[in-house]
């Protein structure tokens, strides 16, 4: 008899611990979850702010790694930025408020292309991770950006100007009840970024708590990377 997908559900994938070396000599811990079959695309995940408990195991990211390789053929790459700790361990270095984390993002992107030989790489940021994505995930080989709950606290107009000129697609999921940037403010902030698709999510909050919100976020990810795999199952 089929069972409902639950927060604890872990579907089959090849999972391996990784160590990413930064240009300033730090080792960052992470995990790659690779589909057992065809890879439809790869997704590098930039986590929320570690000063508020953000890490590679933040719930949306862990559930994506537990489900999307099997459900959608998506390879998931997660890692802890410098000084960040999760169940798998702690990355070397110290949290630097998004400054030295630039080197972490650059190293992780390079790891995807050089070590994993990624062909179709997408980058997702959540909260603090959206700032890292918009500021540092600019490698021309990256296909698109996905933003969850972007607070837009440190991303500048100059950063947005880069993406306006660059033209690559950006998708931003904006919670109706966000703590930092709600839909109307996001519309204003992103008004000049014509290549940004804003999706306003009724009833959502900054942390996307609850299985309905998890399913929605994962479905939007799959719609971008592997649309033929929709709809995502809600039971197995």
Q: Language-model segments: what does each one mean?
A:
Residues 1-41:
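N-terminal cap/lid segment of alpha/beta-hydrolase-fold proteins
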Residues 26-116:
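Serine-hydrolase catalytic machinery in alpha/beta-hydrolase-like enzymes
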Residues 153-154, 176-181, 206-207:
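Acidic catalytic loop of the alpha/beta-hydrolase fold
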Residues 158-160, 181-191, 213:
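Short alpha-helix in the alpha/beta-hydrolase fold that links the catalytic acid
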Residues 166-167, 172-174, 178:
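Short beta-strand/loop motif that positions the catalytic acidic residue
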Residues 191-207:
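Catalytic histidine neighborhood in serine/cysteine hydrolases
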């Amino acid at each position: 008899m089929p069972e409902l997908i639950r927060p604890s559900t872990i579907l089959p994938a090849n999972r391996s611990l990784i160590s990413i070396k930064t240009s300033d000599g730090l080792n960052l811990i992470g995990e790659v979850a690779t589909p057992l079959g065809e890879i439809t695309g790869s997704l590098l995940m930039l986590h929320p702010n570690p000063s508020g408990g953000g890490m590679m195991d933040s719930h949306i990211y862990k559930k994506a790694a537990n489900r999307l390789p099997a459900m959608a053929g998506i390879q998931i790459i997660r890692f802890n930025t410098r000084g960040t700790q999760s169940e798998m361990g702690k990355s070397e270095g110290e949290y630097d408020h998004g400054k030295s984390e630039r080197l972490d993002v650059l190293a992780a992107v390079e790891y995807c292309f050089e070590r994993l030989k990624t062909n179709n790489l997408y980058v997702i940021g959540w909260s603090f991770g959206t700032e890292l994505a918009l500021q540092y995930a600019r490698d021309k080989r990256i296909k698109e950006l996905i933003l969850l709950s972007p607070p837009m606290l440190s991303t500048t107009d100059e950063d947005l100007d880069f993406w306006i000129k660059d033209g690559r697609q950006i998708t931003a999921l904006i919670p109706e009840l966000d703590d930092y940037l709600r839909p109307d403010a996001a519309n204003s902030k992103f008004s000049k970024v014509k290549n940004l698709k804003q999706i306003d999510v009724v009833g959502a909050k900054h942390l996307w708590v609850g299985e309905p919100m998890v399913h929605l976020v994962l479905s939007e990810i799959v719609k971008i990377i592997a649309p033929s795999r929709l709809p995502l199952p809600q039971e197995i």
